Amino acid sequence: MENIRESEIKHSAIRVATLLCVFALVAVAADQNVVVLLWPNGAPGSEGKTALEKVRITPDGEHVITSVYQPSITVYLPSREMATGAAVVIAPGGGHAELWVDHEGYAVAKWLSEHGVAGFVLKYRLAREAGSTYTIEGNSLPDMQRAIRLVRSRAAEWGVDPQRVGVMGFSAGGDIAARAATQFDAGDSAAADPVDRLSSKPAFQALIYPGLPPDLPVSRDEPPAFLLCGADDRAGISEGLPALFIQLKHAGVPAELHVYAGVGHGFGVRSANTGAIAGWPDQFLEWLSTIGFLKRK
């Protein structure tokens, strides 16, 4: 009897250990997010470039990405119960030479997904990285435009309303988001690739301490804008963003501007953020609600 009991105990222990392993694997899988290439067969302008992107980890544990040859989006979806149908393509900053994907990418997308908004972190090609042959207009902007189209093409799969796909950009990523909000098209109905038949116009734009291009055109055709920066940021941003707000207002584009006293550049979404700046994502969400983009359909 003792041997039988010992055997039963051993088998029970094995079953428990197996279940724990299964639960652990499920937890790991749930914590991993799908990465989707913008062009599965290779990005135009990156022919023959198959090297993997490089990842540098800072002393603070931040992940910084360089050498992006095949641009992609990392997908963060809300639960079905939370999903509002709204979606944001997020462009991290890094001076067009690198991508700070944590506090200006993954953390943002995760927060949004937990509040019912699908987040897609864009890894775009870098125009100012040492030795780069890419340009902002020729590669980085098309990466953003393709990402918008791609999200729309998989809207049903991802629980997204194709009419509520917007863009958000931080610093250099804000440059790209701002360009995407002014340079767009309805798609090419004759394109061989179904993705290219869809519109690249974002439904809204969120520019977070953006490095604005000096020649950015402003027109009444732009989508609604959420603008945000710190008062202590460099003049091109802390003065340039309010100037853009005035231009948008004169053009008849709905816009909201937030300038935070005593705040500089690069705050993003961090657990270390304190004071008023820690609540900026909530203000963005409130703005989305105000313009009617969080209403479930």
Protein language model features and the residues they cover:
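Catalytic nucleophile-loop/oxyanion-hole region of alpha/beta-hydrolase
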Residues: 100-101, 107, 125-159, 271-277
